[in-house]
């Protein structure tokens, strides 16, 4: 389904792209793909919008994912939400360069929304930005990512396809057709005190940027124990797999 605004300009063709989705096995592959998309948009005069709702606000080690593309590949617009306040209060923002949102393009009272002046959202955003700077959370995201990569490179579980991360956000891809599934791993981890999100063939792991080293080490230890033990389990409450379904 799609919606076309009755006042939409038929000559305006924007492209919104989540630059770093952690779907490839390497960070560099996603960066190069995003650069290629951005350059195609520039070549054909297509508005390029960077979707930073989930992966923006420092998670990858830079404040914006688009920062990884280099200054010559900046997007025309950026949309942010969710992570911009550290999850403390709902807020969303649209950023744009002068060619798209400058004073010659948008006049007073041409934009607005019901909650655009929500004081709580504004304060939550400003406070989160202050904490990012004071606690050097961009560097912390990089440190978390490096530590995660160092720990997981020695994991040799036969059902793991590959492990990859972008700063403090990570994915563990599971080979299809196994008794071991992302959902079974996630449910067993949940019982042991660690929440990870099963999504398709992968486990998505998002580390809080203010996590302590002790909390990180404890969580990674639990995750490793789950991966070591999961093949020996039959039924895992909350998980659904043919291996758990009793024969009729």
PLM region spans:
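Conserved N-terminal phosphate-binding loop of PLP-dependent enzymes in the Aspartate aminotransferase
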Residues: 1-2, 6-9, 14-248
């Amino acid at each position: 389904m799609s919606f076309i605004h009755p006042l939409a300009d038929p000559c305006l063709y924007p492209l919104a792209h989540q630059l770093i989705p952690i779907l490839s096995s390497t960070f560099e592959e996603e960066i190069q793909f995003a650069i290629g998309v951005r350059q195609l948009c520039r070549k054909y005069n297509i508005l390029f919008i960077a979707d930073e709702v989930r992966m923006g606000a420092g998670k990858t080690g830079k404040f914006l994912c688009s920062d990884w593309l280099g200054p010559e590949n900046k997007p025309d617009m950026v949309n942010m939400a969710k992570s911009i306040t550290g999850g403390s209060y709902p807020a969303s923002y649209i950023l744009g360069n002068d060619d798209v949102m400058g004073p010659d393009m948008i006049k007073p009272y041409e934009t607005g929304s019901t909650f655009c002046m929500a004081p709580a959202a504004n304060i939550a955003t400003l406070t989160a930005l202050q904490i990012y700077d004071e606690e050097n959370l961009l560097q912390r995201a990089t440190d978390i990512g490096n530590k995660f990569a160092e720990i997981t490179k020695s994991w040799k579980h036969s059902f793991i396809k590959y492990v990859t991360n972008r700063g403090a956000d990570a994915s563990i891809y599971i080979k299809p057709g196994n008794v071991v599934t992302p959902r079974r791993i996630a449910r067993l981890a949940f019982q042991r005190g660690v929440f990870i999100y099963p999504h398709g063939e992968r486990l998505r792991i998002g580390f809080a940027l203010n996590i302590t080293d002790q909390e990180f080490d404890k969580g990674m230890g639990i995750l490793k124990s789950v991966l070591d033990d999961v093949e020996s389990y039959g039924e895992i409450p909350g998980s659904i797999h043919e291996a758990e379904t009793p024969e009729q």
